[in-house]
């Protein structure tokens, strides 16, 4: 018996038998998910808080465009964008030394005391507390002291004053916030009033944190504290006199005295009057 091969012809060139059935089943599954409420919901875009419906709430500019600006050759010479972000206050005050002056003071004192930076940190702590108690007057001299447990250690005050430009008080204003926090810490343990406040007879214990002469008044200083600090400063400066010139020690008599005196004269500045002596 001769075996003959059967030849099968397909209508399409792609063999996808049964694939249409799988696609139909998958389509029914998706339809079922939509009907069961599991369809993916596309959210609407967020609505800006400044809008209500189709109306937009206007925003005001920080600086109006109608300002009279410094002009040269018809062009403004100020940058308003930079000015809006430039909000420095403390470091611009003439009441405190500049960063360069403070650095020069620090380096000069460290060189004069022949100390390392780690030791200088301890020295500055002690000097700040000493200034809280004794002030930063330019008339102070001698030594300043620091306690090591029960031992009192003295340091010459001259390097602190010599390197302080423009003044020691302006240098110490860099320590104003730290000194205020130190007084507040001491007051939590027990009532503490700096010597500056005791001399001015400050009786309100809550104002002790402002009772030192290098306190830096800022915009956040309470009105009552500001008044108390200025009153203490006025009391400290009430009887102080500042003389521009001292006594000139180079004083000589440039006039020659040619007056002749005898033993019968009444006194050194008066001759006798026909033998009559004054009473």
UniProtKB/Swiss-Prot annotation:
Site note Cleavage, residues: 11-12
Organism: Tamarillo mosaic virus
Enzyme class, broadest EC rank: transferase
Protein name: Genome polyprotein
Keyword terms of this UniProt record: Capsid protein, Nucleotidyltransferase, RNA-directed RNA polymerase, Transferase, Virion
Reaction it catalyzes: RNA(n) + a ribonucleoside 5'-triphosphate = RNA(n+1) + diphosphate
Family to which the UniProt record says this protein belongs: Belongs to the potyviridae genome polyprotein family.
Annotated coiled-coil segments of the chain: none
EC identifiers of the protein: 2.7.7.48
Listed GO MF terms: RNA-directed RNA polymerase activity
Post-translational modification: Genome polyprotein of potyviruses undergoes post-translational proteolytic processing by the main proteinase NIa-pro resulting in the production of at least ten individual proteins. The P1 proteinase and the HC-pro cleave only their respective C-termini autocatalytically. 6K1 is essential for proper proteolytic separation of P3 from CI.
Gene Ontology CC terms, in alphabetical order: viral capsid
Record lineage: Viruses, Riboviria, Orthornavirae, Pisuviricota, Stelpaviricetes
Pfam name, any one: Poty_coat
């Amino acid at each position: 018996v001769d075996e003959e091969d059967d030849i099968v012809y397909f209508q399409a060139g792609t063999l996808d038998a049964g694939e249409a059935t799988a696609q139909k089943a998958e389509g029914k599954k998706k339809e079922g998910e939509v009907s069961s409420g599991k369809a993916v919901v596309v959210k609407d875009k967020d609505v800006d808080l400044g809008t209500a419906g189709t109306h937009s709430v206007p925003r005001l500019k920080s600086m109006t465009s109608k300002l009279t600006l410094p002009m040269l050759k018809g062009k403004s010479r100020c940058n308003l964008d930079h000015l809006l972000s430039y909000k420095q206050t403390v470091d611009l005050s003439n009441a405190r030394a500049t960063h360069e002056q403070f650095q020069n003071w620090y380096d000069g004192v460290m060189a004069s005391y022949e100390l390392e930076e780690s030791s200088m940190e301890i020295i500055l702590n002690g000097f700040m507390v000493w200034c809280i108690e004794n002030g930063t007057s330019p008339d102070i001299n001698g030594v300043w002291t620091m306690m090591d447990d029960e031992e009192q250690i003295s340091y010459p005050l001259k390097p602190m004053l010599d390197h302080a430009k423009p003044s020691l008080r302006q240098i110490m204003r860099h320590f104003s916030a730290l000194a205020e926090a130190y007084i507040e810490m001491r007051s939590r343990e027990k009532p503490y009033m700096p010597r500056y406040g005791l001399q001015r007879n400050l009786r309100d214990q809550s104002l002790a944190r402002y009772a030192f002469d290098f306190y830096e008044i800022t915009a956040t200083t309470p009105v009552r504290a500001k008044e108390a600090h200025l009153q203490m400063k006025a009391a400290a400066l009430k009887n102080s006199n500042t003389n521009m010139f001292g006594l000139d020690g180079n004083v000589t008599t440039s006039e020659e005295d040619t007056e002749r005196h005898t033993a019968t004269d009444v006194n050194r500045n008066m001759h006798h009057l026909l033998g009559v002596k004054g009473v």
